[in-house]
Each structure stands twice: as structure tokens, then as C-alpha cells.
From Swiss-Prot:
It comes from Xanthomonas campestris pv. campestris (strain ATCC 33913 / DSM 3586 / NCPPB 528 / LMG 568 / P 25). NCBIfam families: pheS. It comes from the Bacteria. This is Phenylalanine--tRNA ligase alpha subunit. GO terms for molecular function: ATP binding; magnesium ion binding; phenylalanine-tRNA ligase activity; tRNA binding. It catalyses: tRNA(Phe) + L-phenylalanine + ATP = L-phenylalanyl-tRNA(Phe) + AMP + diphosphate + H(+).
Length: 336
């Protein structure tokens, strides 16, 4: 009996002194395993006198239960300590300065395009879209371009082998818009703008083979040139957020009659003022209205077009159009 008590006391001390789960498992096997010391005591019960077996068995069972409980409790203590140590090692110091994310920004051409569209939306114009690969009818014929017009020449237009082309202006969207309005009997009256990429075989400091254009169209029973002037004057004032002296110069565009180019009195860095062309416009040619099934005797309309990059250059003081397409981060970061 004293032997089991001594063995139990020593075993409990060893369990309490274990510092790792591996040490604890080694003790468990040595004490309670198949060949463990407590197990050996149970096997020796049969060799004891009959009057001692009951008391010895009770003592061994009590020792086994005490050791099992001690092993379980010590295991829990070691696991908790290990978890605390891991949490401490992985703790995030919230007082450290964070990593700042780089703030992006819209491209200046995109900013300008969205600004133009938003202004015309306030004036009641609906944004419409169309294909960049266009057919001859929508890009030229329906817009009153005679077959001999210079804009049809190969040096102005990018053609595909099947006769299709990269649109040279967004006016083709106006034709599609009017076609749909007539077919669905949703207009006229109608007003819309088309915005997107256009393509022309031209490249220098102020021209790019690909650029962005916004064109607008209004068709109604009583629209006139005064309405056109008022619309464009309001747009220019809203875009630049200041008033400009404007002039409308007679000009020729096949799809309008009369046609005009719009100049604004632009102040130079040296304080002088010069006229700067910013828009083309005019009253929709009757042939264009007829091509989409609108009666020009009843309806009139006006149209206008502008280059987005041109307005971006003026708004941001950029002198070279090509800077918008070179993807120089040093340049683009100024607009972020």
C-alpha cells in the first residue's frame, strides 16, 4: 500500500513538472500504458493474499484516477500556455502606421468626357452609343456625303477589305438613333448625344489617329439656329465655368445647312486674346432627315460636334495632344 502511495506521489510531481505535451505523453505511457507502472501494479493483484486484494485494488484504482485527472489538467494548462504564446507572437500592433494604398484617378480624357455628357444630360439630352466599325451608309451616305467628298479618300478613313470602316465621326449614331425613333414611333421630337472613339488617318501635335468625339442632335417642329446658339453658349459656360465671347463662323459640313464653326475668345498666358475654334455645328440638312424617314417640311433640327481631347487640352492647359496617349505616369499623376 505504501509503495502505491509513494509511486503516485512521485508520478503527480513528475506530471506537474512536465513542460511540453511530449513530456506529458511520455509520462502517461510510463504510468498508464500497457507496460506502465500503474498497469503493472494491477497485474500483480493476483499475487497478493486474498485479504489484501480488495484494499490494494481500491488504492491502485484511486491512484490511476488521480493520475488520469492530473494528466488531463496538465495537458489543458500546457495547451492554454501554448495558445497564449502563439497569440502574443502573432499579435498585431495597431499603433504601427498602416500601409497607405495608392489612390488612382480617372484619365483626363475620361474626366472631360464624363463632364461633357453630364452637362448635356442636364439639358435633357439622352446618351446613345453605336459601333466603332461602321458601314458606308451610316458613316457617309445617310449623312449627305456625296461619293466624291474628300472625307471618303483613303488618306482620311481606315477601310476594311469588306468595305466597312472605322467610323470617322460619331454622327452615324445619330442616324441609328433617328432610325430607331421613327421605327418605334418614339420621336421626333428627340434630342441625343453620342460619345466615343473615332478614327482618322492623321497624326501630329494636335491630331491623333484615334480620338474621342461628342456629337449632339435635336429634332423638333420649331427648332432653329437661335436654339442651337443658346444650347452651345450654355454648354461652353457650364464646361469652363465662366463666360466667353463666342462667334459663329459660316462653314461647310455635308450633313448640316447652314453650317458653322464656333470660336471662343481665349485668353493667352501673356494676357492677349485670340479666337479659338472649339465646335462645329449647324441645322440638320433636309437630306439627312429624309434618309431616316423624317419629314423635313414638318421637322427641323440642329447638330453639333466637338473633340473631347481638344476640350481637355484647354481645361488642363495641355499643349500636346499626344501626351494623353503616352501613358506617362508623371503626366497622369497630376490628374489623380
Amino acid at each position: 500500500m505504501s509503495e502505491i502511495q509513494s509511486l503516485t506521489a512521485q508520478a503527480l510531481a513528475d506530471v506537474a513538472a512536465a513542460h511540453t505535451p511530449d513530456q506529458l505523453e511520455t509520462l502517461r505511457v510510463a504510468l498508464l500504458g500497457k507496460n506502465g507502472s500503474i498497469t503493472a501494479q494491477l497485474k500483480q493483484l493476483g499475487t497478493l493474499p486474498a485479504d489484501q486484494r480488495k484494499a490494494a485494488g481500491e488504492a491502485i484504482n484511486l491512484a490511476r484516477d488521480a493520475l488520469t485527472t492530473a494528466l488531463s489538467e496538465r495537458k489543458q494548462v500546457l495547451e492554454t500556455a501554448a495558445l497564449d504564446a502563439r497569440l502574443e507572437g502573432e499579435r498585431i500592433d495597431v499603433t504601427l502606421p498602416g500601409r497607405r494604398g495608392e489612390r488612382g484617378g480617372l484619365h483626363p480624357v475620361t474626366r472631360t468626357l464624363e463632364r461633357i455628357v453630364e452637362i448635356f444630360a442636364r439639358l435633357g439630352y439622352e446618351l446613345s452609343d453605336g459601333p466603332e466599325i461602321e458601314d458606308d451608309w451610316h458613316n457617309f451616305e445617310a449623312l449627305n456625303f456625296p461619293p466624291h467628298h474628300p472625307a471618303r479618300a483613303m488618306h482620311d478613313t481606315f477601310y476594311f477589305g469588306d468595305g466597312r470602316l472605322l467610323r470617322t465621326h460619331t454622327s452615324g449614331v445619330q442616324v441609328r438613333y433617328m432610325d430607331t425613333a421613327v421605327a418605334t414611333k418614339s420621336g421626333p421630337p428627340l434630342r441625343m448625344i453620342a460619345a466615343g472613339k473615332v478614327y482618322r488617318s492623321d497624326s501630329d501635335q494636335t491630331h491623333s489617329p484615334m480620338f474621342h468625339q461628342v456629337e449632339g442632335l435635336l429634332v423638333d417642329e420649331h427648332s432653329n439656329f437661335a436654339d442651337l446658339k443658346g444650347t452651345l453658349s450654355e454648354f461652353v459656360r457650364a464646361f469652363f465655368e465662366r463666360d466667353f465671347e463666342m462667334r459663329f463662323r459660316p462653314s461647310y459640313f455635308p450633313f448640316v445647312e447652314p453650317g458653322a464653326e464656333v470660336d471662343i475668345a481665349w485668353q493667352q498666358p501673356d494676357g492677349s486674346t485670340r479666337w479659338l475654334e472649339v465646335l462645329g455645328c449647324g441645322m440638320v440638312h433636309p437630306n439627312v432627315l429624309r434618309s431616316v424617314g423624317i419629314d423635313p417640311e414638318r421637322y427641323t433640327g440642329f447638330a453639333f460636334g466637338l473633340g473631347v481631347e481638344r476640350f481637355a487640352m484647354l481645361r488642363y492647359g495641355v499643349n500636346d495632344l499626344r501626351a494623353f496617349f503616352e501613358n506617362d505616369v508623371r503626366f497622369l499623376r497630376q490628374f489623380a
